């Protein structure tokens, strides 16, 4: 192989890598134990607020599950974050050995506190959710899908990945199993908190189900 051909192939390869986002210059990658706990706690606290009927304009939830951290989902989300591309992961790649479909929330920003900022931003979509949408999910209208995935009753597992690039932008990808946001399906069953739990109430979050 001559030098010119070798150089051409190298340039093409680098173009493919950078174009796919894999050429991102990562300053920080991954989540430590405290960061994982922060993300999980923020999600469950938000879910409990809604389940207990403490969120203005939202009915209480009879069957909303407590979320648990899942390392396989987190590894999947980390791979997506490391592309440094602010786009949802292809649905065909959002699955694990247990879950055939994972929901996903994504965030990009240059603020120094990406975890609380992203979770709060997703949750803030609650202002556009009506009891009618809780009863029958619809994606038409204002953006609400980040919030509705956060509080989807049947979702039980969470895993996230984080990258901070050299341009100071952070990319946080969170994936949820099983995924939610199914059109015409209820986000959760309306009723007294944790009144329709199949396996009892959570000991840490009594408004949520095990």
Curated annotation (Swiss-Prot):
Pfam families: CAP (PF00188). GO terms for molecular function: calcium channel regulator activity; toxin activity. This is Scoloptoxin SSD976. InterPro entries: Allrgn_V5/Tpx1_CS, CAP_dom, CAP_sf, CRISP-related, V5_allergen-like. It comes from the Eukaryota. Voltage-gated calcium channel inhibitor. Disulfide bonds: none annotated. The keyword Disulfide bond applies. Keywords: Calcium channel impairing toxin, Disulfide bond, Ion channel impairing toxin, Secreted, Signal, Toxin, Voltage-gated calcium channel impairing toxin. Residues 1-23 form the signal peptide. It is found in: Secreted. It comes from Scolopendra dehaani (Thai centipede). GO terms for cellular component: extracellular region. Belongs to the CRISP family. Venom allergen 5-like subfamily. Expressed by the venom gland.
